[in-house]
A protein has these predicted regions:
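Membrane-embedded catalytic cores of phosphoryl/pyrophosphoryl-handling enzymes
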Residues: 2-13, 130-255
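Transmembrane alpha-helix boundary/anchor motif
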Residues: 21, 25-29, 103-108, 190, ...
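Membrane-interface interhelical connector segments
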Residues: 112-139
Length: 258
């Protein structure tokens, strides 16, 4: 998560945004590579193995955050015990996944950016008009094409890659890139998204992760520590824990000071 990665991501954002903004037909040409005009469908979406691979990709991505989520739940139950996972790891993984694959994707753009999916546009024998990535005035009402939630989730694996040991980090970043690209390619092959939907999803995820990593691990003014996070969670969950112990006839004092 260095400045080189940031500059590459911003450069790609600029190039892809301008190129596909000026020549939106490129999105249609890339989508057409997966379309069978004779069958009037995107045939790969009916392939059982491809469908399983799509589901498995999401299971793999979510598996990276399960330990952090479980550790947070256990901390809520037993705030008197130390966190089982590093505090910064929990905050970093949960915050980046929530923002990139949740808030920015499904709760914001996909709900209000009315771009129809490839499978329903006129060029692929659907009823709706194609619109370029930058135009929110499409006829899609909900769960729209821009930008891809599954693409954002797949590329979110940059977050656990950023926490890999330094000697393994380049390989982890490469694996996250391949994983995100393969998952995004499947979404395109199913007619679920255009190239710009998945590419921008990946870039948004990367930028969210880069900023969160800098705030949590690097910048002195915002940098957190595992101990501070553990102490803050103890204070947060202590009142409920104390009330539960009182119901069991056990009197305990206030939360331990940091």
């Amino acid at each position: 998560m260095n400045r080189t990665g940031l500059f590459i991501a911003l450069g790609l954002f600029l190039v892809i945004g301008l190129l596909f903004g000026l020549y939106p037909e490129l999105d249609l040409k890339l989508a057409a590579a997966f379309y069978d005009a004779a069958e009037k469908s995107f045939p790969l979406k009916f392939n059982a193995i491809a469908a399983f691979a799509r589901d498995a990709a999401m299971w793999i991505a979510w598996a990276f955050v399960v330990p952090s989520f479980a550790a947070l739940i256990w901390k809520a139950i037993r705030p008197d015990r130390p966190l089982l996972v590093k505090g910064r790891t929990i905050v970093f993984l949960l915050a980046t996944l929530t923002l990139s694959a949740g808030v920015l994707t499904n709760l914001t753009f996909k709900s209000y950016w009315g771009r129809p999916r490839p499978v329903v546009v006129i060029q692929f024998d659907g009823p709706e008009a194609f619109v370029p990535w930058w135009d929110p005035r499409g006829t899609c009402g909900r769960n729209c094409s821009f930008f891809s939630g599954e693409g954002a989730t797949a590329f979110w694996t940059y977050a656990p890659a950023a926490l890999a040991p330094p000697q393994w980090r380049p390989l982890a970043y490469a694996a996250a890139t391949v994983f995100g690209a393969a998952t995004s390619g499947l979404r395109m092959a199913f007619g679920g998204h255009f190239f710009t939907d998945v590419a921008i999803a990946g870039l948004v995820s990367f930028l969210v992760i880069w900023l969160a990593y800098a705030m949590i691990y690097r910048w002195p003014r915002t940098r957190l520590s595992d101990e501070r996070i553990d102490a803050a969670l103890t204070r947060l969950f202590w009142p409920l824990y104390r009330a539960k112990q009182r119901r069991r006839g056990r009197e305990i004092g206030p939360a331990p000071s940091a």
